[in-house]
């Protein structure tokens, strides 16, 4: 019997399913790694073939990044004298517009090379393949270091980010894609670099000449595409009688004409459903920008927040009515009114559906409003989400605020949404629904929310998410970086009553602290005290700056130059 028991004990050790599973997983990971290396090697060979002159200058070692519009490789410059120099090679996709490529290069050459803005060393081209050579900055992953940064390191990080933003904003450059992966950080050397100007736009007074040209080309292209669909009021006298057909149709529709704001006049919906502009300074300089709102037009969109959106024409009758009404309305609006900003939103003479949860056939027949929407989900400002046509450098400051929010809360990504309406609802859970609605009115947008959501106290929110109360630090798995994978807004947000999902301390599995584990606890206490020094005494100035960065009104949002002078950075050298 003892021998029998011995066999039963040995069998699980010799043929352990758990061990077999670990071996299988290890083998699978090894195969995936080999497959990845083979793919990288193939990509490097293709790059050498596409741009042969690279082989004379660089030895490409690895592929270190890949995005929608480019791939980045690590290379060593083969210099005849001096030490080897590491170079980052950015290979732009062949379908990139030549003007866009030239504009990105001009941003790097004019504004880059100082104040934490990446510069450029060389540029190579062969046919439609362009490679930009930039200094290589070895950097850490934001996610890996997020929960080990000391409070002083966070101050230094934000200070250097604002230096970079001040630099590019002085040249009239709107980066449009400010996020941790585009702000490289070498923790050991304390070096920083703002990179990737592929989506950059120019302000109205930009000093980057090619950004002006990009805007002009983009606007002319949209105007030419919609020229055949535009009906002006020049041939219809203002005091003339209303056409009989229009008069008869208007009696069948119980709708009152709504005066057009600047945004409503300029943006229409074409017959083919494409976005277009009637013409007048609608900025959209990004070629090939991705549409991050592909889910927003689906019928199961969130009922919590409803924008006054424009959709395709639903029937021929409403299209005729809208077309003839536009012919008269366009004549009424003179050039002075056309130049008004989107903040002038008339309160009178609106149609029946205005500021309600319904959209009338007249509004459905209008062309969709065109506005710049390029950027990364989770970092886009409210004015971008609501398609405000007049966007400024303030959108970069909002993105910086989201980064600061992640640093203070220990959560990344903080916002995670599949479409614009969900993203707006998540912003409301932090900043408040009433505040969001009021701010939207300042740039001519009407937002409806089914339930009022109060604004959160930023200090309480960040301390709760980091696992600390206002007085004593509490140890949670956030310290080991486990909670950084959880967005502050859950993916399962209830859109009928959007709310913040919080995880109480001690409910994480895996690496959570346990009372009986004295060795690991002692080690983590030491690491906690070393790396998280200062987190139990976060000053009010930090949350005041965060509040100003996340100002829902872009007109009053703090600028990079003002942020550098904020008391949060006192006693720090600029």
Swiss-Prot record:
SMART domains: S_TKc (SM00220). One of its GO terms (molecular function) is metal ion binding. Residues 58-574 form the Protein kinase domain. The modification Phosphoserine is found at residue 27. The modification Phosphothreonine is found at residue 503. There is a cross-link at residue 268 (Glycyl lysine isopeptide (Lys-Gly) (interchain with G-Cter in SUMO2)). Its main location: nucleus. Its EC number is 2.7.11.1. Coiled coil: none annotated. ATP binds at residues 64-72, 90. GO terms for cellular component: cytoplasm; intercellular bridge; mitotic spindle; nucleoplasm; nucleus. The keyword ATP-binding applies. Disulfide bonds: none annotated. Pfam families: Pkinase. It is an enzyme of class 2 (transferase). Its cofactor is Mg(2+). One of its GO terms (biological process) is positive regulation of cell population proliferation. Keywords: ATP-binding, Cell cycle, Cell division, Isopeptide bond, Kinase, Magnesium, Metal-binding, Nucleotide-binding, Nucleus, Phosphoprotein, Serine/threonine-protein kinase, Transferase, Ubl conjugation. Belongs to the protein kinase superfamily. Ser/Thr protein kinase family. CDC7 subfamily. This is Cell division cycle 7-related protein kinase. The gene is CDC7.
